[in-house]
UniProtKB/Swiss-Prot annotation:
HAMAP family hit by this protein: Formyl_trans (MF_00182)
Family in the record: Belongs to the Fmt family.
Name by which UniProt lists this protein: Methionyl-tRNA formyltransferase
Annotated CDD domains: FMT_core_Met-tRNA-FMT_N, Met_tRNA_FMT_C
Annotated organism of origin: Chloroflexus aurantiacus (strain ATCC 29366 / DSM 635 / J-10-fl)
Length: 310
């Protein structure tokens, strides 16, 4: 099939590679423009662009799809169908109307749950035990189009957002190449979503990762996994940020001020009082330092009466 592919980050590469391996004709790959990245702010191409160039596929990097000249360029490619995997912009009607079969989208949740930009983080924060991936048809609204197929995936209590997102897009890529030909032949009836069950996630900001020690330990522990790799769950010590990479819930009587280091675990890691129970800091990263064990950080602090968040 003649496919127009839209995607940008590393986990979107799984879908592009799967489509190429399945023998589809990729008439164009639309991805975000090169952006400055790293400490030296060097202009860096999106991972999807790198993958597309490796297969000698035509690449387009418009600043926005709202530009009428961009719409004309995409239309001239004459795709039969579009595939979207974390492109980074909601498609407007002018773009949606280009392929006769519309656009299939990979969304890493069991829609209508966790619509929006951060479904994996949302599921982890909520303490879900299962999640999944949905192949859906795009419409002008956000993640509200009819469903073609879903796969249910276990969400273990140690899952981290970055790794889980990659896994879900791998599963989604396999599901996509199974669904696409059947959909094109009319063998799959799109199923409308139950909008009454919909939940919506938000775009994350850096400050979302700042720890409020008055929250229960279980909530903060989930933050360390939901906000990995960005924005990270962090606090402050002596005015400098301290990222909490890995943590565990520990029992505590709750008589201490939240944020206070109340002792050590059996492994020597600091135990921090929270609004309910304590949080064992297993792995942390001080500002401008490499990640280290919580016990190593505590040994290097050389202070009594430690209170985090200040």
């Amino acid at each position: 099939m003649r496919i127009l592919f839209l995607g940008s980050p590393s986990f979107a590469v799984h879908a592009l590679e799967a489509l190429v391996a399945a023998g589809h004709e990729i008439v164009g790959v639309v991805t975000q423009p090169d952006r400055p990245a790293g400490r030296d702010r060097r202009l860096t191409p999106p991972p999807v662009k790198i993958a597309a160039m490796a297969h000698n596929l035509p690449v387009l990097q418009p600043e926005t799809l709202r530009d009428p000249t961009v719409v004309e360029t995409l239309s001239a490619l004459q795709p039969e169908v579009g595939v979207v995997a974390a492109y980074g912009e909601i498609l407007r009607r002018a773009v949606l109307s280009i392929p006769p079969l519309g656009y299939l989208n990979i969304h890493p949740s069991l829609l209508p749950l966790y619509r929006g930009p951060t479904p994996v983080a949302g599921a982890i924060l909520a303490g879900e035990t299962v999640t999944g991936v949905t192949i859906m048809l795009l419409d002008p609204s956000m993640d509200s189009g009819p469903i073609l197929a879903q796969a249910v995936v276990d969400l273990p209590p140690t899952a981290r957002a970055g790794q889980l997102t990659d896994e879900l897009f791998r599963i989604g890529a396999d599901l996509l190449v199974q669904v696409l030909p059947r959909y094109a032949r009319g063998e799959i009836e799109p199923r409308p979503q139950d909008h009454s069950r919909a939940t919506v996630t938000k775009m994350l900001k850096k400050e979302d990762g700042r720890i409020d020690w008055s929250l229960p330990a279980i909530v903060i522990e989930r933050m360390t996994r939901a906000y990995d790799p960005w924005p990270g769950a962090y606090t402050f010590w002596r005015g400098q940020p301290l990222r909490i990479i890995k943590a565990a819930v520990a029992s505590a009587d709750g008589t201490n001020v939240p944020g206070t280091v109340i002792g050590r675990s059996g492994s020597g890691h600091p135990l921090v009082q929270t609004g309910s129970d304590a949080l064992e800091l297993i792995e942390v990263q001080p500002a401008s330092r490499r990640p280290m064990s919580g016990s190593a950080w505590l040994a290097g602090v050389h202070a009594d009466n430690i209170r985090l968040g200040e």
